[in-house]
Structures are given as C-alpha cells and as structure tokens.
Regions:
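Short, charge/polar-rich alpha-helical segments
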Residues: 1-19
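Intrinsic disorder/low-complexity segments in short proteins, especially the signal peptide
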Residues: 12, 16-17, 27, 46, ...
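Short, charged, amphipathic alpha-helical segments
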Residues: 9, 35-50, 70-77
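Non-transmembrane amphipathic alpha-helical segments
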Residues: 11, 18-26, 32, 48, ...
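Intrinsically disordered, low-complexity regions enriched in serine, threonine, proline
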Residues: 18-20, 37, 48, 60, ...
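Amphipathic alpha-helical binding modules
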Residues: 70-96
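Amphipathic alpha-helical coiled-coil segments
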Residues: 46-67, 85-93
Length: 96
C-alpha cells in the first residue's frame, strides 16, 4: 500500500469517528438543560468541525496529486464535504 493510500485510509476512519461524534453532540445538546454541559458540547462541536475542515483541505491536496478519477482520495473529499455540510445545516440547532 502506498503511503498516500495509508494516510487516506487513516483520514477516512478519523472522519467517520468525528462525524459520529458530531451527531452525538447534537443529540445530547438538544436533550440537556444543563448550561455548563451545553457550553462544553458547543466548544467540542466547534473543535471537531475545525478538524474535519483540516481533513477536507488535506483531502483536496491528495485528490490533486492523484490523476485517477475513482480512488480513496475522492471518497475522502466527498465524505468530508458531506460531514461539513451536515454540520453547517444542523448548526442552527445550537441557536434555538
């Protein structure tokens, strides 16, 4: 396995974990009344969103360096893009 493939696979796994955590945070945020917990959840959500954004930038670079149309880099770009869009769309939950 090439080094970039290994990196891409690791990033795919990380994005999957981050995406699940972001969903769990939103669910917790909606169901709790504790202001301190809501503050921590909001902060963690922001940090995770930043990390997914960083991974998206890396994925774009990997995609540029790989001439193939169908590959893991393209999959990584698509998954991170969907995670970012899902988080942007649902970010309104924090301002209810």
């Amino acid at each position: 396995m090439k080094e970039s493939q290994s990196l891409t696979n690791n990033l795919l796994m990380e994005v999957e974990v981050l995406s699940n955590r972001l969903r769990n945070i939103k669910q917790c945020y909606k169901s709790t009344e504790n202001k301190a917990l809501k503050g921590r959840l909001f902060s963690e959500n922001k940090n995770l969103f930043k990390r997914v954004s960083e991974i998206y930038k890396i994925a774009e670079l990997l995609k540029k360096n790989n001439p193939e149309n169908i590959n893991f880099s393209n999959l990584l770009v698509e998954i991170t893009k969907r995670t970012l869009n899902e988080n942007k769309f649902e970010s309104n939950l924090f301002f209810l």
